A protein has these predicted regions:
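Family-specific signature for flavin-dependent thymidylate synthase
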Residues: 1-305
Length: 305
């Protein structure tokens, strides 16, 4: 989990003011140019008004491009189900670099000399060496978790023997991948053997409406799969840093429903007990009295705000 990094690459810098101005434009005779010069207090008020009226179309004018680096393909496949976004993902042909690093570390520990890059000594010979090093690492009792962790994601539920078994299976799969490359199978076909746990990176562009109405409510929730929940909470922290007047109100589905049916309060207020839930139950059917505990659980599993 600690190797998953979420960073904000680019965003609409004046997004808060732009959203407030767009919201006011729909109800004003003034020109958008004049509206944009509104004081900061008015920006805050118009943003709150979009929550009160569930008027989120102005939020589409502010756009955010961010990176999820080191997550698994299990996570990225869930991520791309969000249709109102643009994605660019590292090709699986280029995740081979992390597999090769695992093979080279194993080779170094075992005293096996493997070329650092396939082209240095003929690709097939290099692939044979990588495969041999990985297989020997599994047989010889080297720490498989240490070797596999840079290349693969381990679910936190795996501990003890289960963790070691998973690591050995990851390394064995990588060894077989290199065995296929060594006999001339293309990378496009050999990659069918690589587990979904392999790390990847993906660049995502979403507008603020997609973030507050769909991605963050669904993926910050306790019911979301642990890895994409971690990505969502990390992203929320980055968004609050740059546009607090927009994203301090955002959160899991319980918070979104509460904030669109009553006077909105910041997510931190719900976490710290300064605001209470009045909805009878959340969209996941958790009753009112259990919502805050569920929210704290989601936040705790994601590393706490």
């Amino acid at each position: 989990m600690d190797k998953i990094r979420v960073s904000l690459l680019a965003y609409t810098e004046d997004g808060e003011r732009l959203i407030a101005a767009a919201s006011k434009t729909s109800l004003s005779r003034k020109s958008p140019e004049k509206i944009l010069s509104m004081p900061d207090e008015e920006v805050e008020e118009w943003i709150r008004e979009t929550w009160r009226r569930q008027h989120f179309s102005p939020w589409e004018h502010s756009v955010y491009t961010w990176l999820a680096d080191g997550c698994s393909r299990v996570c990225s496949h869930q991520l791309v189900r969000h249709r109102l976004a643009s994605y660019t993902q590292q090709s699986m042909r280029y995740t081979e670099g992390s597999l090769r690093e695992a093979a080279l570390e194993a080779a170094g520990l075992l005293g096996i000399e493997c070329p650092r890059k396939p082209r240095e000594a003929g690709a097939r010979r290099a692939y044979e060496c990588y495969s041999m090093a990985l297989r020997e690492a599994v047989r010889s009792g080297l720490d498989p978790v240490r070797l596999a962790k840079p290349a693969f994601v381990f679910p936190p539920s795996l501990r003890g023997e289960a963790l070691v078994e998973a690591a050995n299976l990851y390394l064995e799969a990588a060894a077989r991948y290199y065995s296929l490359l060594a006999v001339g199978v293309s990378r496009e076909d050999a990659r069918f053997l690589i587990p979904h746990a392999v790390r990847t990176r993906i660049v995502v562009t979403m507008n603020a409406r997609e973030l507050v109405q769909s991605f963050l409510p669904l993926r910050m929730c306790t019911r979301a799969q642990w890895e994409i929940r971690l990505v969502a909470w990390k992203l929320w922290k980055r968004l609050v840093e740059v546009h607090p007047r927009l994203f301090k109100w955002a959160g899991p589905r319980c918070v979104f429903q509460q904030n669109t049916t009553s006077d909105p309060r910041p997510l931190v207020d719900y976490l710290e007990g300064r605001a209470s839930f009045t909805i009878p139950r959340c969209p996941e059917l958790v009753p009112r009295e259990g919502i805050r505990a569920c929210l704290l659980h989601a936040n705790g599993r994601a590393g706490r705000v």
